[in-house]
């Protein structure tokens, strides 16, 4: 996402796995902070330099068109992430693998402290979001302080959106 959790997750995955065994997919909702696009550009450059495949997944819907169709995103109807992030990422994986029914492992940078719903997540699951997809949430129990300590200790790029008072760097 270009946020702090994704930055940590990407660093951990790059250290744990051979670069030819995974790809990075940025789900571009079209509603990101300009600072987030700067961070993603930096991450893409780093991936290109170390040979890690980097892709961008976008919805075929224009964000304004989606708002007109579905109304503004809300806690009750959270269409935004599925329409502009999750589904385009799934479509991109199908394109990359050349298979509609691929089996893959998705590393997700979610944390239990972010919401009540996320506090109920498991470290791993199979097929909850996408058939054939294993999901692994390695930083699930990390606190925000632990994420920031990791970022500063590893000298990872910080999204300027945080320095401007935003508590998150995902879509607007």
Outline where the language-model segments fall.
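Class I SAM-dependent methyltransferase core
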Residues: 1
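Nucleotide-activated chemistry modules centered on ATP-dependent adenylation/adenylyltransferase
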Residues: 4-172
């Amino acid at each position: 996402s270009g946020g702090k959790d994704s930055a940590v997750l990407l660093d951990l995955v790059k250290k744990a796995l051979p670069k030819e065994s995974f790809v990075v997919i940025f789900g571009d909702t079209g509603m990101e902070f300009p600072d987030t696009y700067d961070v993603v550009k930096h991450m893409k450059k780093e991936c290109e330099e170390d040979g890690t495949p980097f892709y961008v997944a976008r919805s075929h819907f224009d964000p304004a068109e989606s708002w007109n169709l579905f109304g503004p995103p809300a806690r009750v109807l959270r269409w935004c992430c599925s329409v502009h992030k999750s589904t385009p990422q799934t479509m991109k994986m199908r394109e990359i693998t050349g298979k509609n029914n691929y089996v893959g492992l998705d590393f997700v940078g979610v944390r239990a402290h972010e919401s009540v719903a996320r506090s109920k997540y498991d470290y791993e699951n199979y097929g909850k979001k996408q058939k054939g997809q294993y999901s692994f949430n390695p930083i699930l129990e990390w606190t925000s302080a632990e994420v920031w300590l990791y970022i500063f200790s590893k000298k990872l790029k910080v999204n300027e959106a945080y320095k401007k008072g935003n508590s998150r760097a995902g879509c607007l």
